[in-house]
Amino acid sequence: MQSITEIKSLRSQIKAWRQAGLSIALVPTMGNLHLGHFSLVEKAKMMADKVVVSIFVNPMQFGANEDLDNYPRTLDEDKRGLADLETDIVFTPSVETIYPNGLAAQSFVDVPDISLGYCGGSRPGHFRGVATVVTKLFNLVQPDYACFGEKDFQQLQVIKTMARDLSIPVEVIGVSTMREVSGLAMSSRNGYLSNEQKDSATALFKVLNNCAEQLKSGNTDFATLEETAKQSLQQAGLKPDYFSIAQRDTLKAATLDDNKFVILAAAYLGSVRLIDNLQVEV
């Protein structure tokens, strides 16, 4: 596995692969890798001849009161895990490499509509940061495929929309959420939770499942389902940020004409913000 930090070295290797007619898959990450990330790498290996994993804690997608400085950084451990999976390149640029003129002077990518609401409403500027850094990575790696986890479902749809709107020739692939035995979605932020909090956090998946079962049984009173779910989360000790039933592909509010839904949820457990979702087809 090659460990690359500089753009020139990355581009040189990408050019050689392209000249050899090899296909490339990209897995963008912020590090602190877990089994969910490794499942993305496994999917990438199935799709392409060569796999590039980027590890970059992107300051542009963190808000003023968010945990950029405290975000877990486990680079040595991450590299060992990626080497075990026979990843071809791990790209670990510095902030100065990605944003040489600083954030204030950086051009950015905004994806309208689909980036608003849900996490976009709770974290203003977040998806601008995500879309900008992913666009830069797409330009640098020029992948045929890019793998993202479905746990961050709005992010996945934002990136699909961005790639389509900007005519970027990449197939954006969503990979199913990896879960703990308890049902809790794997996340780098789970490391902030105590064992007791992890037990409480399982309520998020349970409430999502209950709502999904109601939809499958024909209940289309979306507003009541959402309100009941929020109350259930509160009773379990979580503070709901949002709980919404949406059209799966557009993320607009669900209507009676829809049959493909995604239930999107975010809730706080102490200071830790958890997100999860379930896709439902009826």
Swiss-Prot record:
NCBIfam families: cyt_tran_rel, panC
PANTHER family, alphabetized: CYTIDYLATE KINASE/PANTOATE-BETA-ALANINE LIGASE (PTHR21299), PANTOATE--BETA-ALANINE LIGASE (PTHR21299:SF1)
Location(s) in or outside the cell: Cytoplasm
The organism of origin for this protein: Pseudoalteromonas translucida (strain TAC 125)
Involved pathway(s): Cofactor biosynthesis; (R)-pantothenate biosynthesis; (R)-pantothenate from (R)-pantoate and beta-alanine: step 1/1
Full protein name: Pantothenate synthetase
E.C. designation(s): 6.3.2.1
Highest classification ranks of the organism: Bacteria, Pseudomonadati, Pseudomonadota, Gammaproteobacteria, Alteromonadales
Residue sites binding (R)-pantoate per the record: Q61, Q155
InterPro entries: Cyt_trans-like (IPR004821), Pantoate_ligase (IPR003721), Pantoate_ligase_C (IPR042176), Rossmann-like_a/b/a_fold (IPR014729)
Pfam family, one: Pantoate_ligase
GO cellular component: cytosol
Binding positions for ATP per the UniProt entry: 30-37, 149-152, 186-189
Binding site for beta-alanine: Q61
GO BP field: pantothenate biosynthetic process
Subunit structure comment from the entry: Homodimer.
Active site (UniProt): H37
One Gene Ontology term of the molecular function aspect: ATP binding
Purpose: Catalyzes the condensation of pantoate with beta-alanine in an ATP-dependent reaction via a pantoyl-adenylate intermediate.
Catalysed reaction equations from the record: (R)-pantoate + beta-alanine + ATP = (R)-pantothenate + AMP + diphosphate + H(+)
UniProt keyword annotations, A-Z: ATP-binding, Cytoplasm, Ligase, Nucleotide-binding, Pantothenate biosynthesis
